[in-house]
């Protein structure tokens, strides 16, 4: 599964991808949230895409731009999303583009 936008493709990370992300994470503030995402995605295999991180990659280069996550299943039809970008990709509209695509996808789900 992937979502494609004008400049990005978004892929929900499988458990191995989450483990790789955790191993590469140097920001101590992200280790626990990423660990929680991995644990919750494993605990909810039928709805794992709502609990895992989604990698954000540039369409043209395939470079990692950042990630976003849903904070579990939407409550009352309203998804909650968190996101982070590498500093060199901030202030260029990537987060807006990714969040729009993720919300569009979320609202299409039953």
What kind of region is each of these model predictions?
Residues 93-96:
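Glycine-rich acyl-CoA binding loop
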